Amino acid sequence: MSYQAIYSVVTRFSLRWSQITPRAFRAKSSKGIIFLSVAIILLACSAQDAEAQKILTIGSLNTANQFANAFEGFKGRMLELGYKEGQNVRYDYRNSKGNADALRSMAQQLVDDKVDMIVTTSTTGTVTAANATAGTRIPVVFLSAGNPQKLVKNYGTSGSNLAGISSASLELTAKRFELLKELYPRAKRIAMPVDPKGVNYQSIVAEIQESTPRLGYAVSEVHVLSVADVAKVAPSITSKNYDGIFMPADSLVTEGIEEWVRQSIKEKLPLATSLLVNVKRGCLLTYASDYTALGKQGAVLADKILKGAKPADLPIELPDKILLALNLKTAKAIGLKIPKEILLRTDETFE
């Protein structure tokens, strides 16, 4: 209740009191009325101040370092929208770094802490958050999901406590292989490191089987079961057995990016990736959404929800832009010359 409304109520009450009570009784009770009026105003003001000073807690559930820039974009846009860290919002940042057990524990901790919202940066993180928040009123906003079909019934409305942005990662798989063919036409045998227990595994394999045979590729799965596994598995990918490497948006595989890049350069194999940030870190190419931009896009959704919108009523959004990115230093290291016509189409280059 506003100060003006409180004042109006007290004034009307005092006027009504003067009309219906005897003069003698009024005189004796006037001090009591004044005290009561002041008490009402002070209590209301105290409640208003408490509400104004409430600090929202937003939990961030990340599954790999490579997805972290989505949350950085989110925080930056939230600041622009008026959410100042330490003043009216607090962020509880968690990163499982590819560990599924740790991820489940972190999600449950956020629920137990009764956070106001959980923000995720991958399909794996979102599925885990959805399971942890089942039966609660905690909204989950996913800043990037390569496979939203795992999360919602349709793109029009989620019908649940989930809302967010699709990275369109699966849909762009064929395009990445087409680019690899343009850059390295002789590539036929492709190694694909992947977690067979991952949330996206079946969808990734189905998309690969559908999109790559027509391009003349034979894609072989190289299974990775833990982060520690990466250093053991990566050396098995050699130029004797393969012509190139493709890294899907797999949280566990992505956490070992340095090993895959090191092996690709050592064996002079082109390495295509599903993540823009991985090109900056040494992969040769990608055609993908910008996770920082996705984070900013997701902040607008979060703002709507924090102001009263229901996640179930919000449509799943698509990326505002898709970028072609190349790492020219890596191209030189593996002895690959980038055709001029491809360079002219490139949105971002890293050296």
Question: Model segments located where?
Answer:
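Short hydrophobic alpha-helices and adjacent helix-cap/hinge residues
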Residues: 1-351
